[in-house]
Amino acid sequence: QLLISRIINSAIGAASRPASGAYVADVTSEEERSSGMGKFGAANNIGTILGPVLVGSLVGLNIFGAQIPQFGLLTPLIVMSLIMTLAAIFVFIYLPNNKTVLSSEEPRSKIVLDTRLKYLISIGIIIFTAFALVQSITAFYIQDRFNYDLDNTAQTTAILLGTMALMAIVSQLTIVQRYKGSPLNLIKFSIPLFITSCLMIIFSPNFLLLFFGMATMGLGMGLASPGYTSAASLNANSDNQGAAVGLAMVAPGIGFAVGPFLSGILYSTSMNLPFIFILPLYFLLIIIIRKLELIN
């Protein structure tokens, strides 16, 4: 039953983000696309921060008064279900459906997985694979690097991942909101931040520099993520930009599947190898972006 519930939860979660991104693409103009995707990304990161805090506050609490042994462990899941129900109601009531009605004589263009979109998806896979790789080894890296016990490891990992999410929110609500240029430039701006963050982590003599390295990676991700989704939508025609975003959202799924798998293999060889491994990926990113710009 637990396995089935996790499958259902993952299926809903995997569908909600592409659908939300596609909606943002459909209701924003080309000039507002990066800004809209930045707000969308910031909302996701706020949830990333508040979710663990909410779970920690609710676990063990039997706020429903049920006479069931260990029912308090299920409280976060019940509250999550209620929140999702409220979100669904909010969507149906308050979000306008601005779907364009096409005449029967006007053929609707279909989203095509052309060379440009293939390059874009490749860019997304690299970005999210590298990010997922770092996320998945953070706890192990902290524990092995500083010889922390389990409690200190959990607390420090929460601080680092929370800082990454917070810095992503900062860049998405400040830099991205004011930026009006090409979305690909946001990805290019993020690459030096990614490279710098990896070097800071690899050569950090203490926890402080490691902390700033993770924060810098969060800033980079706050630029790269909306830049990627905006570029994907602007790659399509006006009547299928939402579909393009939905298709482009396959990249985070692949990245968060491949990243943790690679991290285990690399980390078993050396604790710094995952960070060394992703450095060439960022240079590959530069090459792909350059090819995409030549096509455009």
Give the location of each predicted region.
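Structural signature of the two symmetry-related core transmembrane helices
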Residues: N185-M200
